[in-house]
Amino acid sequence: MSDSFYRYDVIVIGGGHAGTEAALAAARAGARTLLLTHNIETVGAMSCNPAIGGIGKGHLVKEIDALGGAMAKAADLAGIQWRTLNASKGPAVRATRCQADRNLYRSAIRRIVEAQPNLTVFQAAVDDLIIHNGAAEGDSVRGVITQTGLRFEATAVVLTAGTFLAGKIHVGETQYAAGRMGDPPATTLAARLRERPFAIDRLKTGTPPRIDGRTLDYTMMDEQPGDDPLPVMSFMGQVSDHPTQVSCWITHTTEQTHDIIRGALHRSPLYSGQIEGIGPRYCPSIEDKVVRFADKTSHQIFVEPEGLDVTEIYPNGISTSLPFDVQLALVRSIRGFAQAHITRPGYAIEYDFFDPRGLKASLETKAVGGLFFAGQINGTTGYEEAAAQGLLAGLNAARHVQALPAWSPRRDEAYLGVLVDDLITHGTTEPYRMFTSRAEYRLQLREDNADLRLTGVGRAMGLVDDARWARFSSKQEAVQRETARLSALWATPGNALGREVVDTLGVPMSRETNVLDLIKRPELSYAALMRVPTLGPGVDDAQVAEQVEIGVKYAGYLDRQRDEIARQQRHETTPIPEGFDYAGVRGLSMEVQQKLERVRPQSIGQAQRIPGMTPAAISLLLVHLERARRSQVA
């Protein structure tokens, strides 16, 4: 092998959702990138539920897509049931979700990875990092060492190890080391990382038993068909990309199910003290649900097919680590599951994660230069949260190599910005999941405008290809043309257009009205307006029509939110230098000093969001920073 085989700009460790997006982003941004995975066959694998998107999560997928990422494209190629959640509510909380064929999804991701220029994939487990100990500039990463002793060099490394760092599986009283069922853990790497100055703790997650769908009685369940017409996930996607569509089903646990679980809690690793890690609040195990909601006589279960060519079913809602004999009994007590055959047991898995307050907004670690963390190791849960972090870390790893400034979106620019800011400012003690409720500016952060918010900046950083840019530019121009066309037209009670509007739509008109303003009426939409002969048929592109309507109907709310953002931004981006001496700021209490020292915020905005931070403390910081700036100028 030539020396170039061992030397890269960026190395990504791990081929899951964070790792693949990180490697693809680094390569698109111009870095010669190596993706190391313990098994090439599992690149892009969906380890838990076979679904992409949902409330908050779908927003992240759209943002990944707007920045040129792969997740939405793969979802379009693998989605076997599609739904728009909150379809009857406002655009800020509408979310796209697809049930995915896990084999089609994995294949789609692998094809995208293998077709990406600048990106090499190599199968190897990583046991250690090569760290340069610089006396003056601090520690920095220089590469990795594999299990077989190969040394790969790079000036930026992205670690996306998922649940593999010291992973331990629990099924009842049985426990053993694993990264997920069937895969070995990264035990040596975990031990090496514990020797470094990182704050490390344990989290846990779980997965339900898988069921042979041929052994279920669907007549006892409620069918849940997908939407018609079908949505798409990617801005570049088409309905024709989707494979064959199928239904999901809904059933429920019974009182017998709950009795079985209560009678076996003493054998649950969750309640025996065997598991130390904290699990995800919003995806609790069935044991947790039965204990925490003791008054409920049943819990809903979504019966989700794992793919078109397999018989396995994913019973969403019964994640468990109970012993297998208990799993079998509880499964067969569920409506329609009396004859169920379990193909794989459910289990819980504990793993190492790093306190994300040890990260910069770029996801570079504060302790080791050039080392980036992304995904579950930062305390998050979910494919979408991992993929979004991976894209950001991969991009910034490439920019680190190229000596370019790091980039991270603000809270008012992207859910990705909310995610990262929450993590690096507040940290987390339980797996973090994205919800629309976490964003204070969610009317600005809609699925439908992810491209408008992020594609321009993505293009400037090399993430967006020519085809996407051309289509995005065309959409923008079409929105502007249609908005201008309608705003130039006026309807009055006496003119022909006004009479057409009244006759066609049955709406009253007492004074001269701009046609565009008609969309602001609650009972009217762009589609309704286009039924007026003089105005129709309108634009063919549904995305363009949607942007025109939302831009008009919510103009007042959007303007007020933009004003609020402008006020908040006054000091948001004021930087705080690395190594800033908080003890030198006169008037800061010891409590505030300790909080600032622990988080080490990179900006005044981040400092403001530290729990317990006072307006007085922020004022003192601003005064001190301004004095320092003036003394440097002088």
UniProtKB/Swiss-Prot annotation:
InterPro entries for the chain: FAD/NAD-bd_sf (IPR036188), GIDA_C_N (IPR049312), MnmG (IPR004416), MnmG-rel (IPR002218), MnmG-rel_CS (IPR020595), MnmG_C (IPR026904), MnmG_C_subdom (IPR047001), MnmG_C_subdom_sf (IPR044920)
Q: Which cofactor does it need?
A: FAD
Q: Where in the cell is it found?
A: Cytoplasm
| Residues at which NAD(+) binds | 279-293
What broad class describes the main subcellular location of this protein? cytoplasm
User: What are the protein's UniProt keywords?
Assistant: Cytoplasm, FAD, Flavoprotein, NAD, tRNA processing
Please, which domain of life does this record's source organism belong to?
Answer: Bacteria
Coiled-coil regions listed in the entry: none
Single Gene Ontology MF annotation: flavin adenine dinucleotide binding
Asked if Flavoprotein is a keyword of the record, the answer is: yes
Please name the PROSITE patterns in this protein's record: GIDA_1, GIDA_2
Residues binding FAD: 14-19
Which GO biological-process labels does this protein carry?
tRNA methylation; tRNA wobble uridine modification
The cellular component terms of Gene Ontology attached to this UniProt record, alphabetical and capped at eight, are:
cytosol
UniProt subunit comment: Homodimer. Heterotetramer of two MnmE and two MnmG subunits.
What does this protein do, in the record's words?
NAD-binding protein involved in the addition of a carboxymethylaminomethyl (cmnm) group at the wobble position (U34) of certain tRNAs, forming tRNA-cmnm(5)s(2)U34.
Task: Name the protein family.
Answer: Belongs to the MnmG family.
State what protein this is by name.
tRNA uridine 5-carboxymethylaminomethyl modification enzyme MnmG
